[in-house]
UniProtKB/Swiss-Prot annotation:
The gene is dut. Its cofactor is Mg(2+). Substrate binds at residues 72-74, 85, 89-91. Its EC number is 3.6.1.23. Belongs to the dUTPase family. It holds the Pfam family dUTPase. It catalyses: dUTP + H2O = dUMP + diphosphate + H(+). The lineage of its organism: Bacteria, Pseudomonadati, Pseudomonadota, Alphaproteobacteria, Hyphomicrobiales. NCBIfam families: dut, PRK00601.1. HAMAP family: dUTPase_bact. It comes from the Bacteria. This is Deoxyuridine 5'-triphosphate nucleotidohydrolase.
Length: 152
């Protein structure tokens, strides 16, 4: 069963008039984030370039939760545009604007218009770890095998 939590959202002046992030299907894990760029000033991402794109909102996550900013698969597949620091993490104590760091890995310039769906935001529970220093670790079949060690 899906858990639902309440999140306070503040709409910033440049986000006025844009819809709130929304889930596009009944079982979607992420809600789409929209670009809050000025209508007369779209952001053009040249191939190989990146830009911080505003969403026009800030959020107050409940303690024990984070928001992950992830790429939209369609933008990546069709245009090579993705979230550079994927997943971007928004901590529960952050109150600044939610922004999306996009990069264009494609071969053509990509224009981001106001209201365009640019990323998705997934709300997740946070588990904190307590680290314990030791001189040995338990044995596993994999051992210290790293990159590529489990085959192709």
């Amino acid at each position: 069963m899906t858990q639902t939590i309440a999140i306070d959202v503040r709409i910033l002046p440049h986000g006025a008039g844009l819809p709130l992030p929304a889930y596009q299907t009944a079982h979607a894990a992420g809600m789409d984030l929209l670009a809050a760029v000025a209508p007369d000033a779209p952001v053009v991402l040249a191939p190989g370039s990146h830009a911080m794109v505003p969403t026009g909102l800030s959020i107050a996550l409940p303690d024990g939760f984070e928001a992950q900013v992830r790429p939209r698969s369609g933008l990546a597949a069709r245009h090579g545009v993705t979230v550079l620091n994927s997943p971007g993490t928004i901590d529960a104590d952050y109150r600044g604007e939610v922004c999306v760091l996009l990069i264009n890995h494609g071969k053509e310039p990509f224009t981001i218009q106001r209201g365009e769906r640019i990323a998705q935001m997934v709300i997740a529970s946070v588990v904190r770890a307590e680290l314990a220093i030791t001189t040995t670790l338990s044995e596993t079949a994999r051992g210290s095998g790293g990159f590529g060690s489990t085959g192709r």
